[in-house]
Curated annotation (Swiss-Prot):
Pfam families cross-referenced by the UniProt entry: MFS_1
Main subcellular location: Golgi
GO biological process: transmembrane transport
Family per record: Belongs to the major facilitator superfamily. CAR1 family.
A single Gene Ontology CC term: Golgi apparatus
Compartments reported by the entry: Golgi apparatus; Membrane
PANTHER family noted in UniProt: MAJOR FACILITATOR SUPERFAMILY, MEMBRANE TRANSPORTER
SUPFAM superfamilies hit by this protein: MFS general substrate transporter
Membrane-related topology note: Multi-pass membrane protein
Protein name according to UniProt: Uncharacterized transporter SPAC750.02c
Superkingdom of this protein's organism: Eukaryota
Keywords: Golgi apparatus, Membrane, Transmembrane, Transmembrane helix, Transport
TM annotation in the entry: 79-99, 117-137, 139-159, 170-190, 199-219, 275-295, 313-333, 355-375, 380-400, 421-441, 448-468
Length: 485
């Protein structure tokens, strides 16, 4: 490839190293991802985003077939819904393990190993002979598939300067978010066909295998300490004054101890950083609610509107359209407002400048979920609740994207572990909320059930104005010290 040849040329002819002095180069440095050609960066973003998309696609892939699976395995709908809960819990534990591991061994090997196992795990899921087998392999599928989700934010922080990062973060988080909305559209028709629900997972295997092929070809290492270590290993000894991170290698650590430390690190960061706690509560609540709606969505159309599974699956298009529409609205507006705040601040950007769009997003999500719930409750013409679900999807994107970018901007190269801490709480709520879907709407009906969810989100979202005004002071009072973790 042209970009790679440029980097190789620079590597061999332009870099001269004298121990204890900086490495000089007149062209893009293959060991500094921020200087790579834009096309090389975008290729990494596309591969990582595809991994994350398919991981999230797998989250709701069997939602339209819950009744079919329950019938085959002679189980209740709630027990089968555990397939979504355990998958999300697998993603949670994956974030605990894979994000810090990538900060020891690099991003690329973690991506490739984890995603290879994820693809292969679709085989035993499709061949499950009982519910226990189905649930166990769903958990491990979520665990190993989480490599894109747990390290994506960190990879983008590796690749782009803060001023250029916003639009790529929006693309990444949008692709991440539309996966659960697209999967049921396809699965809805599979569930009512004669080929069986198993093909929902065969299709996921095919898509994952195709993406894995391109990942092996195109994905590059981006984590700076790992690249710097390789750089100094090639051009000279590491001096005493070089960063400690460059002297650490995985060979010096016992695997068991490393995994234990890896699981502890994101939790420790989360609990010690007030801004992360606020962000985690807000993102966790809205993520749990969107997961709850996705699981209950097809049943709403079947019970209230007598739609077939295939047509009920098509209704997920409204959520997906809302997600896409928010990108074209939120991305330019949020970036312009961020640039305005930077200019007003004398050209210096602050992480808190990412937050204003989140205020709007939470408000829209609450409007959308109330409109969806009450119109479905009274069986108003089907187009009206789809408007509510579209607004809800847009509100989700407009809330989660700015908050995720806020975490990335605040923690830089340690954003993988910081984001993992937030995702732990987010995924925990995402795993728990769907379990309550059936009982919530049965006892309170769709109207009052959605009203309760809206009030919970309102309470959590009150932290955003506080963070916008006092976030910098809070960060200065509790500065992040990576050596403590």
């Amino acid at each position: 490839m042209k970009e790679e040849s440029i980097l190789k040329k620079c590597d061999s002819s332009s870099i001269k190293h004298v121990p204890s002095t900086p490495l000089e180069t007149n062209c893009p440095d293959k060991y500094n991802p921020k200087t790579w050609p834009i096309r090389l960066k975008v290729r990494n973003v596309i591969v990582i985003s595809s991994m994350t998309f398919l991981n999230q696609y797998g989250d709701s892939v069997f939602a339209p077939s819950i009744s079919n699976i329950a019938e085959q395995f002679h189980a209740s709908r709630t027990l089968v819904t555990l397939g979504a809960t355990l998958y999300t819990l697998g993603i949670l534990f994956g974030n605990l393990i894979f994000a810090p591991l990538s900060e020891q061994f690099g991003r690329r090997p973690i991506y490739l190993i984890g995603y290879s196992v994820f693809a292969l795990l679709q085989i035993p899921i499709a061949l499950s002979v009982n519910l226990a087998m189905f649930l166990v392999f769903r958990f491990f599928s979520g665990l190993f598939g989480s490599v894109g989700l747990s390290n994506g934010s960190g990879s983008l922080a590796d690749l782009f300067e803060k001023k250029d990062r916003g639009k790529y973060m929006v693309i990444y988080f949008t692709v991440l978010s539309i996966g659960p909305g697209i999967a049921p559209i396809i699965s809805g028709f599979i569930s009512q066909s004669s080929i069986g629900w198993q093909w929902e997972f065969w299709i996921l295997l095919i898509l994952s295998g195709f993406n894995l092929f391109w990942a092996f070809l195109l994905l590059k290492e981006t984590y700076p300490p790992v690249l710097n270590r390789k750089k100094f290993e090639k051009y000279g000894e590491i001096g005493e004054n070089e960063p400690v991170a460059l002297r650490l290698t995985g060979k010096q650590l016992l695997i068991k101890l490393l995994i234990l430390l890896s699981m502890k690190k994101p939790i420790s960061i989360l609990l010690s950083q007030p801004i992360l706690i606020c962000v985690a509560c807000t993102i966790g609540s809205i993520y749990g609610m969107i997961n709850l709606v996705l699981i209950a969505f097809s049943e709403v159309w079947k019970s209230s509107y007598d739609f077939s599974p295939g047509i009920s699956g098509l209704m997920y298009i409204s959520i997906t359209l809302g997600l896409f529409s928010a990108v074209f609205i939120a991305m330019p507006i949020n970036q312009k407002f961020y640039s305005y705040l930077v200019k007003r601040n004398g050209g210096e950007g602050e992480p808190e400048f990412r937050l204003p769009m989140g205020f709007i997003g939470i408000t829209l999500f609450e409007i959308g979920i109330l409109l969806f719930g009450w119109t479905a409750r009274y069986k108003i013409f089907w187009f009206v609740p789809t408007i509510g679900s579209a607004i809800m999807g847009g509100g989700y994107i407009m809330t989660s994207n700015p908050l995720n970018m806020y975490v990335v901007d605040s923690y830089g190269i340690y954003s993988a572990s910081a984001s993992a801490g937030v995702k732990i709480f987010q995924l925990l709520l995402g795993a728990i909320f769907p379990l309550f879907a059936e009982s919530l709407f049965r006892r309170l009906n769709y109207g009052w059930g959605c009203t309760l969810l809206a009030f919970i989100l309102l309470a959590c979202g009150c932290s955003l104005p506080i963070l916008f005004k006092y976030g910098k002071q809070i960060r200065n009072l509790r500065p992040f010290d990576p050596s403590k973790y």
